[in-house]
């Protein structure tokens, strides 16, 4: 599975119409509406807000008033052809006064997403876990040896040493067993998308 490493924006002009495409990494379906609302608030005077997204097995698109099949579907095709997932493409169009016709719109929306992908950093992604562990100071060295192969997102100290970690599912199963054997409790476990090495 592939996605973008970070969100990216690009703008092209075709026959006086401005096409601004945003590629946004999404984790859950609620992200789609939230991101579309944000883009609409930034581009209040735009004529169309077309989009396509892929989130696991869910795929959806919208032409937002453009002729049927001329905007959202071509955008979705670009995402599918690049084997992307957990991604939302929103293309905002400011009409420039020249009608492009159905074929011209398909080419314009395709080019807008493709040219934005050209400047994006594409990464391989995998399902994994984010979790926290805490230990007493006397177990700090032991814990750090047990988690040495994991990505440590954060370490903070209070009356204990607290770690926030990310890892893939296979790593998690191994580390979970090691932590349990050493009586170190896993907290706030949640499934996340991680960059695959």
In which residue ranges do the predicted regions lie?
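Glycine- and acidic-rich phosphate- and metal-coordinating loops
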Residues: 53-54, 85-95
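Non-DNA-binding regulatory cores of transcription-related proteins
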Residues: 151-172
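Short glycine-/aliphatic-rich beta-strand segments at the starts of folded cytosolic domains
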Residues: 121-137
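Short beta-strand-to-loop capping motifs
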Residues: 24-27, 133-137, 164-170
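Short Lys/Arg-rich amphipathic alpha-helical segments
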Residues: 80-85, 107-123, 164
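Short amphipathic alpha-helix segments
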Residues: 133-151, 174-176
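C-terminal regulatory domains involved in ligand/effector binding and gene-expression control
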Residues: 1-70, 154-156, 169, 181-197
């Amino acid at each position: 599975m592939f996605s973008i490493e970070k969100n990216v924006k690009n703008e092209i002009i075709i026959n006086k119409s401005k096409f601004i495409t945003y590629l946004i990494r999404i984790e859950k379906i609620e992200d789609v509406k939230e991101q579309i609302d944000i883009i609409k608030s930034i581009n209040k005077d735009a004529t169309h807000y077309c989009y396509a997204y892929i989130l696991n097995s869910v795929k959806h698109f919208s032409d937002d008033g453009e002729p049927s099949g001329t905007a959202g579907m071509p955008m979705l095709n670009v995402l599918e052809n690049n084997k992307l997932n957990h991604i939302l493409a929103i293309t905002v169009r400011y009409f420039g006064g020249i009608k492009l016709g159905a074929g011209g719109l398909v080419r314009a929306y395709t080019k807008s997403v493709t040219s934005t992908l050209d400047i994006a950093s594409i990464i391989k992604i995998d399902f994994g876990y984010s979790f926290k562990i805490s230990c007493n100071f006397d177990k700090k060295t032991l814990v750090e040896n047990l988690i040495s192969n994991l990505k440590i997102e954060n370490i903070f100290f209070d009356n204990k040493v607290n770690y926030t970690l990310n890892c893939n599912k296979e790593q998690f199963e191994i580390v979970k067993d090691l932590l349990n054997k050493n009586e170190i409790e896993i907290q706030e476990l949640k499934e996340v998308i991680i960059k695959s090495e």
